[in-house]
């Protein structure tokens, strides 16, 4: 299939045509405190070095993330993998899902090593379905990537902290991807490694990439084709914040989409509408209140997420 991807700035109001009962929802996450100081500390730690895939800086950041997740009570696994030659043809121009999920389409030699970070809750129940929260933690080779994507990684790490003891109708899966900046290699590896039973047991994915940058507009919600899916509908129904809907696919959300897993991507409205500049290396470019509010919105959705509602909208 050939994908037509639209930029972050082409957003529209989300309309689900559902009953107007949002105000009746109890937002249980209001009892959960998001720690802005931890958000700032995590961004600083993750972005302390350039983190292109396989680099010493990325390995150092992966160890920091691993240590934090372990401290929060998760069982953590590194998914080590080889990175192979990729290009636009094997990604956004892929003719089939299988071509996209072929990690070595050209049968080339490995051009590097990378590692995803997969965290499992201590109360994980294999008989329950799983909702994934994801972000990439690598950067390009010319930046420490405060915005892209220490911002998303720190958001995910804070969500992991407050959700560590979450125990309801489904599991929470936490994954930090490597090599997103090289044709989404990390998420392609993760999704392609899932068997059919594992994929069928996934409710969906919320991916976070480039959030909280000052002057880049509100946080918006993206789906690859710009149309509602079950995850965008649930997010809209279960938060106290209205998100504009836009076409996505420029981040790891594309890998889940190609794996036929419902996915949304959360980013600033104008996140991609710029060249890399000094803001990438400046912690002062981050609006931590915006990230805090995003964390609260995601928590609202998760803590009020009911399988009965999900299955109703899925029909």
Language model features: what each stretch is:
Residues 9-11:
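Bacterial signal peptide processing site
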Residues 139-237, 245, 249, 253:
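Acidic/histidine-rich catalytic neighborhood of metal-dependent amide-processing enzymes
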Residues 44-122:
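A non-catalytic alpha/beta surface segment that caps or lines the substrate-entry region
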Residues 14-62, 72, 78, 86, ...:
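N-terminal capping segment at the start of a domain
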């Amino acid at each position: 299939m050939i994908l037509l991807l639209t930029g972050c700035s082409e957003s529209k109001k989300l309309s689900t045509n559902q009953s107007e009962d949002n105000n009746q929802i109890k937002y249980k996450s209001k009892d959960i405190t998001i720690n802005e100081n931890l958000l700032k500390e995590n961004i600083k730690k993750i972005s302390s070095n350039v983190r292109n895939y396989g680099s010493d800086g990325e390995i150092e950041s992966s160890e920091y993330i691993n240590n934090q997740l372990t401290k929060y009570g998760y069982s953590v696994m590194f998914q080590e993998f080889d990175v192979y030659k990729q290009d636009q043809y094997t990604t956004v121009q892929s003719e089939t899902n299988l071509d996209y999920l072929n990690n070595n389409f050209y049968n080339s030699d490995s051009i590097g090593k990378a590692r995803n970070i997969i965290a499992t809750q201590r109360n994980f129940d294999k008989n329950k379905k799983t909702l994934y929260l994801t972000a990439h933690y690598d950067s390009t080779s010319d930046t420490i990537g405060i915005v892209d994507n220490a911002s998303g990684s720190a958001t995910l790490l804070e969500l992991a902290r407050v959700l560590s003891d979450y125990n309801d109708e489904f599991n929470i899966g936490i994954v930090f991807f490597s090599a997103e900046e090289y044709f989404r290699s990390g998420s392609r590896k993760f999704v392609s490694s899932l068997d059919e039973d594992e994929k069928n047991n996934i409710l969906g994915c919320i991916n976070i990439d480039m959030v909280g940058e000052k002057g880049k507009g509100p946080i918006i919600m993206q789906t690859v084709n710009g149309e509602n899916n079950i995850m965008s509908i649930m997010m809209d129904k279960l938060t106290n914040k209205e998100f504009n809907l836009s076409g996505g696919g420029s981040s790891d959300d594309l890998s889940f989409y190609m794996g036929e897993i419902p996915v949304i991507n959360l980013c600033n409205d104008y996140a991609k509408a710029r060249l890399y500049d000094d803001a990438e290396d400046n912690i002062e470019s981050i609006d931590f209140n915006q990230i805090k509010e995003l964390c609260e919105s995601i928590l609202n959705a998760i803590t009020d997420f009911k399988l009965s509602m999900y299955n109703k909208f899925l029909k």
